Amino acid sequence: MADAASGARKASAHSQFGASGSPPPATATATGFDFGSYGRVGIGSDLRGHSGHAVNVVSFGSRLEKPAYLELNFYYGGMIGDDPEKRWRVVFVPGYSGDLFHATGNFSQNFAIRNAYAEVENLGVSGLSLWAGSRMYRGDDVYLFDFWPLDNLNTVGGGAAYAFNQKRTLLQVQLGMNRLSDWYQFQQVQVPARRLPSSTTVLSPQSATTTVTTLDRQRLVVSAKATQFVRALDQLPNGKIIVYGEFHYLPKGERQPEMVGQPPLPLPDDYGYVLGAQLGGWLRSFVFANLFFRHAGGLGAFGDLGRPFGFGSEQRVWGATENTLALSANYESQLLGVMAGGYFRKWSDANTAEDSGYSEGALAVRPTLYFTKYIHTAVELSYQVRRPTTVDQDAGRYIRPMVARASLIPIVAPLGRGTYSRPFIYGIYTLSWLSADAQYYLFEPQDVRAGRSIVHYLGLGVEWWFNSSYR
């Protein structure tokens, strides 16, 4: 009976944060400084003397050959007063992505701040938490494709969550803004200055100009999410139902022309939305299934960091749409673990005259045999296909790129059995078959990777996570 109760607690703790195998959130009870990390690093060859490379024709392809990505998670928090239920926490997460110095010899890296926020819990109202700052704001993922099909925001703002009904019901709201550095939201131009710059003299030939901001449009993104667990969180089996929505708004503006004498380009206000739902269930920890549906329109179809294109007649993207159906699942036993994931997406822009939209889908399954507690071997099989909506202009016909892949992955897992057991060190061999349309779609004729229907990838890699915050 004690083992069953312990398993229920473990499963419920896992389920509160997605039941998806994502890295768990920041520790909820630590006082003072705490630390966590997520990372993946790999190297590979195509067995033809070139760097190993991914061959994906869909928006979210296999994660096996993804480039290095690293995060360091720093936390500092404690109790409010003497009440252990009332807590505060500061989360700071720098992240790195790209080529490593040891591979390229270039001593410059691509860093970004992924999380920088503070939160308080149960202050004034039991079950209420408040946060503000810059944050990755995500739900459950499809691990095999490194894909968050329902809610995946990168926000600077704040939010609140309220858990009640013995934590079986959770309500969340978020409000944030961004101002992307692209022509659609921001512009600065040089204009004659009203006075000479301080760095020049009256006799200097340097022109007296200054930089002014002529376009500055902040996008507002508001989201709301409701989660209802089927049973109390300490009971198994269990399940949850999620409904989710977003609202996007971009105010009007005016863009200055590149050529002198041309009239400014008016940019009307624009809107977007996301509506979606998720159904999830689990028998025990890491034995689960999730089904997602997402419908997005206007700005919401591009995501919060997406740069709109394919405008309609009024320079709006209101007519753009995205529909996604996705699934993720995992099974664990003493000898075998099985991951599965897949999705279908249909995307269309707002330009009815020449739609750059597409339909795409991908499926993957990864069974893992546990030969010993620490030595495992996985086989991943996957298939992906993409169908652009319009005729390809160069080919003069509709194309349908397809890729089928098979990967063999020997694994050393120092923390034991489990498809989500991390860290793990692994070798990988992937054989990919590319249709003729996939070869045409992915590579220009001059590319050293072009003209191959069979692509090999032989490599080594490592992935880890511990005490990592993704919510």
Where are these regions (language model features)?
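Extracellular structured ligand-interaction cores
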Residues: G32-D34, P67-E71, R87-V91, I113-N115, ...
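Beta-barrel outer-membrane channel/assembly domains of diderm bacteria
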Residues: A2-L130, A163, N330, P367-L369, ...
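Detector for outer-membrane/organellar transmembrane beta-barrel domains
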Residues: R219-F229, L233-V412, W464
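Solvent-exposed loop/turn segments connecting transmembrane beta-strands
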Residues: L64, A103-S108, L150, V317-G319, ...
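Transmembrane beta-strands of outer-membrane beta-barrel proteins
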Residues: T31-V41, K86-V93, L128-A132, T169-V173, ...
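Outer-membrane beta-barrel pore domains and translocons
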Residues: Y38-G44, V93-S97, G133-Y137, A163, ...
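Outer-membrane beta-barrel transmembrane domain signature
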Residues: D82, F186-A193, P197-S223, K252-Q256, ...
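Surface-exposed coil loops of outer-membrane beta-barrel proteins
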Residues: G42-S62, F101-Y117, V125-L267, R307-G312, ...
